[in-house]
Regions:
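Extended N-terminal export/anchoring regions of large proteins
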Residues: 5-7, 74
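Divalent cation-coordinating acidic motifs and surrounding scaffolds
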Residues: 1-5, 13-23, 29, 106, ...
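Short clusters of hydrophobic/aromatic residues that line enzyme substrate/ligand-binding pockets
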Residues: 8, 55, 537
């Protein structure tokens, strides 16, 4: 007959009849409710209880990295999107080598528990982790938050560490200063803005104690310059205090000359820099930008001006399928603003030089569009030329010259095996082959080389694990400098009185950095024993004005103009025209001003040929 597995259960109706009806055959249907399992998985081991200071440890790496931890602290600040926060132990451990604060990262908070607010003292369970990118220093943080419990509310913030009189020479000393403050509240007062708000919402200040002459800070320009200390040593100004906007709904827009009267924030580390993420309530003293022109000049004018100008990504409207230019292709409105600003810059700030040595254009046609804008406004006769390069984005150096005042006799691009090895597709980073223009200026034959060397963007950050930082791009710039110097030597060997200029964005300082010695790119260009010297006209500029670019708050020279002995005799003066690098990046979208038409300041040389 039919098979019934053994098993019965008593009917739970509360009535006992002492018959078979008091029982029911048990169900053995193998549905989810009746399927045997191995049982629940064992719970994970409990998290390791630890104070924030124990999680941070007294070095760069947390001794608890990779472990689930449980800690407590007071919430001091949230990121603007509310997804992450900073937490600080209000009492600390009294050890100056351990941080009392920590960043809690991540994509929201657990479904169980209460969402905290600033001032809440919380218990939190998460995983200790070191966030690190490339050769930058690591950031100790908590991630994968499992639990948050609010223990109390309305707690006052911990006292903020004052940021004043920071280490001002050696980067390792700066790292040693900042690391024990990671994640903690810190404060600046009466600080001087030395770099404008950039496109990432960051700006840089110096404490009042550090903003003194002789430290790299120049009160004339209110900026801090990278400095040559001699023997390959460089002052990279570790006393810089960067302020970011990750905790703000919108960035704080400032420029050199402004002051931060008071600002408190959490110490963070991102993109190779220690920085403050501001809490609400900052007090600022700001001023409006000047009325154009902002450029100033010293010395006589001469009869001819030659200016080198990196115009920063002047691209046309076409996304070229064979170039990596999708991220650089503007909208029609963006291109209109760019051309309007650059045309105003050439007319108002550059004062219509005879020759502009240009970098970062996509092609001759877009450069000619710029020339046509200037011609329509000023009645000049600017003509453009450039040659396609090996650069993956397709940017080129070029010339824009006023054909009503000078003539271009010849233009060509350097070529050959050495050029290929330094600039071409087989080079470490395909780049921009030099462009040579031979100009007739007042009856003088002037040979100008337009250059755009490999950038420093792939080098180690200053605040990195390698000290001194490794500069891997330096090798290629040396190759590029040697190619250019070899061409100059050929010209001067044929005619020692030739008037030769090497100009452009050379992406390097006019002095050696740690480990370079005397064999740095600018020294190669200037020439060694037995070579005719080239003189860098940046040396004629006043110390306070000697910068063409601002990076991470450090004002520095990247753009150069070197001249042969015969051409040096015709020089009257040289000036950097400061109307871009010192101004906030937001002005790049303002067509009503030439300020921030690009990110580099032009370098102008003035000559007397007549």
């Amino acid at each position: 007959g039919a098979f019934f597995p053994a098993g019965a259960r008593r009917v739970a109706d509360g009535v006992d009849t002492d018959t078979a009806s008091d029982w029911a055959i048990a169900s053995f249907a193998l549905g989810p409710a009746n399927t045997p399992t191995s049982g629940d998985a064992p719970p994970p081991p409990p998290p390791t209880p630890a104070t924030i200071m124990e999680i941070q440890g007294n070095g760069q790496i947390s001794p608890l990295a990779g472990e689930r931890v449980e800690t407590t602290g007071v919430v001091t600040l949230f990121t603007a999107n509310g997804a992450s926060l900073w937490l600080q132990d209000p009492d600390g451990d009294g050890d100056p080598d351990t941080s009392d604060g920590i960043f809690v990262s991540g994509g929201g908070f657990p479904m169980t528990g209460t969402r905290p607010e600033v001032g809440d003292r919380i218990r939190i369970v998460g995983t200790a982790e070191e966030q690190q990118f490339g050769q930058a220093l690591p950031l100790t943080r908590l991630r994968t938050v499992e639990e948050i419990e609010v223990l109390s509310t309305g707690n006052p913030p911990p006292d903020a560490a004052p940021l004043e009189d920071l280490p001002d020479i050696a980067i390792p000393d700066g790292i040693a200063f900042w690391e024990p403050l990671e994640g903690m509240l810190a404060a600046v007062s009466e600080a001087r803005v030395v770099a404008p708000t950039n496109a990432f919402g960051e700006f840089v200040v110096l404490s009042e104690a550090d903003a003194v002459p002789g430290s790299g800070y120049f009160p004339q320009t209110k900026q801090v310059l990278v400095g040559d200390l001699g023997a390959g040593a460089v002052d990279y100004n570790p006393e810089r205090i960067m302020i970011d906007d990750t905790s703000l709904a919108s960035p704080i827009v400032v420029m050199p000359g402004d002051k931060v009267l008071s600002l408190t924030g959490a110490v963070d580390f991102t993109f190779g820099n220690y920085k403050l993420q501001p809490a609400p309530g900052s007090e600022l003293e700001t001023h409006a930008p000047p009325t154009p022109p902002a450029s100033t000049r010293s010395g006589p004018n001469g009869d001819t001006a030659i200016t080198t100008f990196n115009v920063e990504n002047l691209f046309d409207l076409v996304d070229d399928p064979v170039k990596d230019d999708a991220g650089s292709t503007p909208t029609p409105a963006e291109l209109e603003t760019k051309l309007t600003k650059l045309a105003a810059a050439i007319e108002v700030e550059l004062r219509l030089p005879e020759v502009v040595v240009v970098q970062e254009i996509e092609n001759t046609a877009i450069l000619q569009q710029l020339g046509d804008r200037v011609n329509a406004a000023a009645g000049t006769g600017y003509v453009a030329t450039s040659f396609e390069t090996s650069d993956v984005r397709g940017i080129e150096p070029g010339f824009l010259w006023d054909a009503d005042r000078v003539d271009l006799a010849d233009a060509f691009q350097l070529a050959g095996p050495e050029v290929e090895a330094a600039f071409g597709p087989s080079s470490p980073s395909p780049g921009r082959e030099p462009l040579v223009g031979v100009f007739d200026v007042e009856g003088h034959e002037v040979t100008i080389m337009a250059n755009h060397f490999k950038s420093k963007s792939e080098d180690d950050p200053l605040f990195g694990v390698n000290q001194p930082p490794t500069r891997i791009t330096e090798v290629q710039r040396k190759l590029q400098a040697q190619v250019v110097r070899d061409f100059v030597d050929e010209v001067l060997a044929a005619d020692p009185q030739a008037e030769v200029m090497v100009a452009g964005d050379l992406n390097d300082f006019p002095y050696g950095e740690p480990g370079e010695g005397a064999d740095h790119p600018l020294a190669i260009l200037e020439g060694g024993p037995g070579q005719p010297p080239l003189t860098n006209l940046i040396d004629l500029e006043k110390d306070a004005e000697r910068f063409t670019f601002v990076f991470d708050g450090n004002s520095q020279v990247l753009d150069h103009m070197l001249v042969s002995p015969a051409l040096l005799g015709l020089v009257r003066a040289a000036d950097v025209l400061h109307f871009n690098a010192s101004f906030p990046a937001v002005l790049a979208d303002d067509a009503a001003t030439p300020f921030r038409s690009a990110d580099h300041d032009p370098l102008e040389g003035r000559f007397t040929f007549g």
